[in-house]
C-alpha cells in the first residue's frame, strides 16, 4: 500500500465496529460510479481492509478509522473526502474527520536511506582508498574535533565509547585520531600507561567487549603485559611487525581487527616471554638418568616421506625407566605447507593419509574439531599455541598429532596425542 488514510469518528450513540464499517460502505456506494465504489476497489486490491478502533464514552462512541490505499494521490484524497461524507451510523448522527494521510513509501524511503548510510559506513572501513597522505591536512582538523576526554583521568577517546557495546583500547592520543580517521569511533587510549592502568579502562572492560590494539613492537607487548594482568580484555590486535597503530592505513587497521587473538591465549605467549621459567620439581628417582618427557627427533627428509619420532615417558612398574617411542611419517610436501603457516594465524586439518580435510582460522579450530567425528582428523597443524584446552579436544576426537608454533603451559598431557613445533620440522 502507498498511503494510510487516518480519520477520527464520533457517533452520538452506542454502536459497534461493524455498524461503522457498514455505514462507510453503504453511504459511499456508487457516489462516483460503480468503478469507484469502495467494495469494488477493495476487491481489486486498490484499497485495503478498513480498520476501526472504538471506545464508548457515556452515550457516545468515539474512535479511529484507518483505510490503506494503493491509489494515486488524487484518488486517495477523493476516498478520504468520501469518508467524511458519512453523516449517520444506524439511527445516530456521526461525524468523520480525516486528520492525516501517511505516505508509506516516504517512511520506507527514509528507512532505506538510513540503512544505506550504515552500509556505506561499514563499507568505508575496509574499502576506503588509501588517500591518507593527500587528505591528512584536511581531515586532521575535522577528526581532531571528534576526540573527547573520557573519565576522571581525561583519557583521549572517540565519541561512541559510552554507546558502543565494544571498545578498542589503544596506547595514545595519536592512535585514537588515526582510528577516528577511518571511522572507528569506539576507541579509547591508555595515554602511554606504564605500570598503572587507568581505573576507567578497567571498569569499561568489565561491562563491554574489550579489544586491546597495540603497536607491533616490544613496547606494545609491554603494554599488553600490564593491561592483561588487571583488565578483563577479550581479544588482542597487533599492528604489523615494526609498525605503530598511529601510522596504519585503513586497510591495515581492518586486517588487524579481523585477525584477533583471544587475550588468554596471547597472555600465555607473554608469560613465556617475560616470566622466568620456573624450576621443575622432580620426584626422587633411582640413579639412572631420566629421559626427557618429550624429545622430538629432527626429521630426515627422504625422497617420499619424513619420519618424526615422538618420545614419551611411560609409567614404570620397576625402578627401570622405560621409553615409548611413536613414529610419524610426514611427507615432505606437508612439511613445506606447515612451514608456510607461520604468521598466517591459520590451521589445516589432515586425515591419516595426510590429505587436507579443512583449512580454518586458528580462532575457529577448536569449534571445528568439536563438530568432527572421533578419528576423522589424524593431525592438526596451526599457527598458534598448544594449550591444555587444545590437547583435551584432540584427545577426545582421537587426533594423533598436533603441530604448532609453540607450546604453552600444560598441566595434564594425554598419552595418545603427539606434539611437535614448527622448529622441530626445520
Swiss-Prot record:
Region span, Disordered: 278-298
Q: Which InterPro entries match?
A: DnaG_primase (IPR050219), Primase_DnaG_arc (IPR020607), TOPRIM_DnaG/twinkle (IPR034154), TOPRIM_dom (IPR006171)
Provide the residue positions that the database annotates as binding Mg(2+) 2: 215, 217
Annotated positions binding Mg(2+) 1:
171, 215
Q: Which GO molecular function entries does the Swiss-Prot or TrEMBL record give?
A: DNA-directed RNA polymerase activity; metal ion binding; poly(A) binding
| Entry EC no(s) | 2.7.7.101
Q: What class of enzyme is it?
A: transferase
Keywords from the UniProt entry? DNA replication, DNA-directed RNA polymerase, Exosome, Magnesium, Metal-binding, Nucleotidyltransferase, Primosome, Transcription, Transferase
Question: Which cofactors does this protein require?
Answer: Mg(2+)
Compositionally biased residues, Pro residues: 285-294
Xref: PROSITE patterns: TOPRIM
How does the annotation summarize its subunit structure? Forms a ternary complex with MCM helicase and DNA. Component of the archaeal exosome complex.
Q: Which domain of life is it from?
A: Archaea
Please give the SMART domains that the UniProt record associates with this protein. TOPRIM
The record's GO CC annotations read: cytoplasm; DNA-directed RNA polymerase complex; exosome (RNase complex); primosome complex
Organism whose genome encodes this protein: Hyperthermus butylicus (strain DSM 5456 / JCM 9403 / PLM1-5)
**Can you state which reaction this protein catalyses?**
ssDNA + n NTP = ssDNA/pppN(pN)n-1 hybrid + (n-1) diphosphate
Q: Which GO terms describe its biological process?
A: DNA replication, synthesis of primer
Q: Tell me which NCBIfam families the record gives.
A: PRK04031.1-1
Protein family per UniProt: Belongs to the archaeal DnaG primase family.
Listed name of the protein: DNA primase DnaG
Q: Where is the Toprim domain?
A: 165-241
Note on how the cofactor is bound: Binds two Mg(2+) per subunit.
Amino acid at each position: 500500500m502507498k498511503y494510510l488514510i487516518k480519520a477520527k469518528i464520533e457517533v452520538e450513540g452506542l454502536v459497534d465496529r461493524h455498524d461503522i464499517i457498514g455505514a462507510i460502505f453503504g453511504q459511499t456506494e456508487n457516489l462516483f460510479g460503480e468503478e469507484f465504489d469502495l467494495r469494488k476497489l477493495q476487491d481489486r486490491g486498490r484499497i485495503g481492509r478498513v480498520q476501526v478502533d472504538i471506545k464508548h464514552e457515556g452515550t457516545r462512541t468515539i474512535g479511529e478509522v484507518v483505510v490503506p490505499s494503493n491509489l494515486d494521490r488524487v484518488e486517495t484524497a477523493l476516498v478520504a473526502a468520501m469518508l467524511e461524507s458519512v453523516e449517520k451510523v444506524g439511527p445516530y448522527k456521526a461525524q468523520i474527520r480525516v486528520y492525516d494521510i501517511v505516505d508509506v513509501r516516504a517512511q520506507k524511503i527514509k528507512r532505506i536511506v538510513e540503512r544505506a548510510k550504515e552500509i556505506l559506513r561499514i563499507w568505508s572501513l575496509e574499502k576506503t582508498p588509501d588517500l591518507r597522505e593527500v587528505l591528512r591536512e584536511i581531515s586532521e582538523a575535522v577528526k581532531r574535533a571528534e576526540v573527547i576526554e573520557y573519565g576522571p583521568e581525561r583519557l583521549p577517546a572517540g565519541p561512541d565509547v559510552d554507546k558502543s557495546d565494544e571498545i578498542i583500547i589503544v596506547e595514545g592520543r595519536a592512535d585514537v585520531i588515526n582510528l577516528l580517521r577511518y571511522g572507528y569511533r569506539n576507541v579509547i587510549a591508555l595515554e602511554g600507561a606504564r605500570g598503572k592502568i587507568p581505573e576507567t579502562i578497567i571498569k569499561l572492560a568489565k561491562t563491554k567487549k574489550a579489544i586491546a590494539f597495540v603497536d607491533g613492537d616490544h613496547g606494545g607487548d609491554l603494554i599488553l603485559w600490564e593491561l592483561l594482568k588487571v583488565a578483563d580484555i577479550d581479544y588482542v590486535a597487533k599492528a604489523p611487525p615494526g609498525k605503530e597503530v598511529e601510522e596504519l592505513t585503513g586497510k591495515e587497521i581492518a586486517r588487524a581487527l579481523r585477525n584477533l587473538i583471544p587475550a588468554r591465549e596471547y597472555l600465555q605467549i607473554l608469560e613465556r616471554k617475560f616470566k622466568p621459567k620456573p624450576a621443575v620439581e622432580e620426584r626422587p628417582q633411582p640413579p639412572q638418568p631420566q629421559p626427557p618427557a618429550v624429545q622430538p627427533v629432527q626429521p630426515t627428509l627422504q625422497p617420499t616421506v619424513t619420519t618424526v619420532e615422538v618420545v614419551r615417558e611411560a609409567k614404570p612398574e620397576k625402578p627401570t625407566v622405560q621409553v615409548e617411542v611413536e613414529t610419524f611419517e610426514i611427507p615432505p610436501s606437508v612439511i613445506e605447507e606447515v612451514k608456510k603457516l607461520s604468521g598466517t594465524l591459520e590451521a589445516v586439518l589432515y586425515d591419516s593419509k595426510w590429505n587436507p580435510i579443512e583449512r580454518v582460522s586458528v580462532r575457529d579450530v577448536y569449534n571445528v574439531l568439536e563438530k568432527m567425528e572421533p578419528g576423522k582428523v589424524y593431525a592438526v597443524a596451526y599457527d598458534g599455541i598448544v594449550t591444555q584446552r587444545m590437547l583435551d579436544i584432540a584427545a577426545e576426537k582421537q587426533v594423533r598429532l598436533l603441530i604448532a608454533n609453540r607450546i604453552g603451559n600444560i598441566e595434564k598431557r594425554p598419552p595418545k596425542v603427539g606434539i611437535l613445533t614448527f622448529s622441530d620440522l626445520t
